[in-house]
């Protein structure tokens, strides 16, 4: 608990613009600032910040309040946690009162999981730097990827030795509870009730929340060391603090660059993100090999409207991920696609090129998603009329889910040219699809109202 005597000083110091702009891109409008609401699926900016009143409010979903309320809602913190966050941000000291036992338990559970994760992160980092295996196996792997020391430090990379329970033993010795080691997924229990490390024999990539807390880990197996291990990457299981669909690898390190460049690059893996950072491109996040969820897209959308998806030169992955891109369009993002040269992924390409060369390559080679999809499917369909009809249906579907009418119109004209069909045809098809979508939405809303 936090004593209230420091509150006026704290609220006075916590400038609402300053606090909110850590998480939302704000643009000046008159005496206020406005941005996309971080609390609901906001297509047009409805989140207002008033520096004069020290308040923020979304005029669509109604959420808002002062700086403390904003942090509580945004970072999922309790009132005392939010006060501590702001006190730390502004360097104000606050005295604490004793918490009630219920408060302690509820706050304790989440906080304990984060504390255990922090311990594990420090432990893995220490092993990487100071343990003989860490240096000869873990560090050797990162060196082979060309990672510099400052980058290894920045992303808090680590190593877990091949002894199956070294982390578990160290944690228990330091007084961390077995229960929390299992709940965070750092360890699991064998049938004979022994604790095993989930990440033994792997290099470690911590996953950070938007505000920089370690919420999970990814571990990559090293070829020579663990023959017979089938799974290349192991990730933390879902937990009370980790919901995979709400986290994006690299977002904490990328958010400022995304705002500055007003664009986000999407790649697939941890090493893609890290290599691009090292080559000087920081506005990049990874979907970690799964399709993007609307929660992840919304997180990016707070910072920018523009997304470029970077693909390896092989075609197999592209067809699979095209479905995910439709979701980006639906959330109102401008999506471009850039194919890297054959045989390169973002990681290998970034190692061969500096930031200027990489950016120049993207500028010259990125295409609008709809144009990209049209050309890709046209190649597939060839002259076959049935396949071409299917292709038109497919593109019409992508265009019909775009929220802004002007953007839809531009795409319709472009597609009509590429496909040698009349605008009118596509206009009426898109209109039909949109009517159908509106009906389905109304039905869904009605069902929810009844239930």
What are these regions (language model features)?
Residues 7, 37, 58, 71, ...:
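Terminal peptide-recognition signature
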Residues 81-134:
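Conserved active-site segments centered on acidic
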Residues 73-91, 202-222, 348-352, 356-360, ...:
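Structured, non-catalytic alpha/beta "coupling" segments that mediate domain-domain communication
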Residues 10-13, 27-30, 103-113, 131-136, ...:
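Conserved phosphate/pyrophosphate-binding and hydrolysis machinery centered on Walker-type P-loop NTPases
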Residues 2-104, 162, 417:
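N-terminal structured subdomain of primase-like DNA metabolism proteins
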Residues 29, 105-120, 161-303, 307, ...:
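Phosphate-handling DNA/RNA-contact segment within nucleic-acid enzymes
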Residues 54-55, 88-92, 100, 139-144, ...:
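Short, conserved phosphate-binding/catalytic loop or strand-edge motifs used
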Residues 209-210, 255-263, 291-307, 312-451:
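A charged alpha-helical hairpin associated with nucleic-acid processing machineries
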């Amino acid at each position: 608990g936090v004593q209230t005597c420091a509150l006026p000083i704290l609220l006075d110091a916590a400038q609402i613009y300053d606090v909110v702009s850590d998480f939302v891109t704000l643009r000046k409008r008159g005496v206020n600032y406005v941005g996309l609401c971080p609390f609901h699926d906001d297509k047009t900016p409805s989140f207002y910040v008033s520096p004069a009143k020290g308040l923020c409010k979304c005029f669509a979903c109604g959420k808002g309040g002062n700086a403390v309320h904003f942090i509580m809602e945004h970072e999922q913190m309790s009132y005392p946690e939010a006060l501590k966050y702001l006190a730390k941000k502004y360097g104000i000291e606050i005295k604490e009162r004793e918490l009630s036992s219920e408060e302690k338990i509820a706050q304790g559970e989440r906080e304990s999981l984060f504390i255990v994760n922090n311990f594990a992160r420090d432990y893995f980092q220490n092993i990487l730097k100071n343990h003989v295996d860490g240096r000869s196996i873990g560090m050797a792997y990162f060196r082979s990827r060309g990672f510099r020391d400052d980058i290894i430090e920045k992303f808090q990379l680590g190593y877990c030795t091949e002894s199956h329970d070294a982390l578990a033993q160290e944690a228990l010795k330091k007084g961390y509870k077995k229960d929390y080691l299992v709940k965070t997924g750092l360890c699991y229990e064998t049938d004979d009730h022994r604790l095993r490390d989930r990440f033994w024999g792997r290099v470690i990539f911590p996953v950070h929340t938007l505000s920089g807390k370690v919420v999970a880990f990814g571990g990559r197996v090293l070829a020579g060391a663990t023959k017979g291990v089938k799974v290349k990457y192991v990730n933390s299981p879902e937990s009370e603090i980790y919901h995979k669909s709400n986290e994006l690898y690299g977002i904490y390190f990328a958010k400022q660059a995304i705002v500055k460049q007003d664009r986000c690059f999407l790649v697939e893996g941890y090493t893609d993100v890290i290599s691009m950072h090292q080559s000087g491109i920081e506005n990049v996040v990874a979907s970690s090999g799964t399709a993007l969820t609307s929660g992840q897209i919304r997180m990016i959308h707070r910072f920018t409207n523009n997304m470029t998806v970077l693909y390896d030169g092989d075609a197999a992955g592209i067809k699979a991920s095209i479905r995910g891109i439709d979701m980006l369009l639906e959330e109102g993002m401008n999506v471009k696609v850039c194919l890297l040269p054959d045989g390169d992924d973002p990681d290998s390409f970034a190692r061969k090129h500096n930031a200027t060369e990489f950016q120049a390559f993207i500028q010259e080679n990125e295409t609008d998603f709809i144009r990209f999809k049209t050309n890709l499917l046209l190649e597939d369909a060839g002259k076959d009329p049935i396949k071409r009809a299917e292709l038109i249906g497919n593109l019409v579907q992508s265009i019909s889910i775009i929220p802004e009418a002007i953007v839809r119109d531009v795409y319709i004209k472009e597609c009509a040219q590429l496909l040698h069909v009349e605008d009118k045809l596509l206009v009426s098809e898109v209109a039909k699809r949109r009517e159908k979508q509106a009906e389905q939405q109304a039905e869904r809303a009605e069902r929810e109202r009844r239930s």
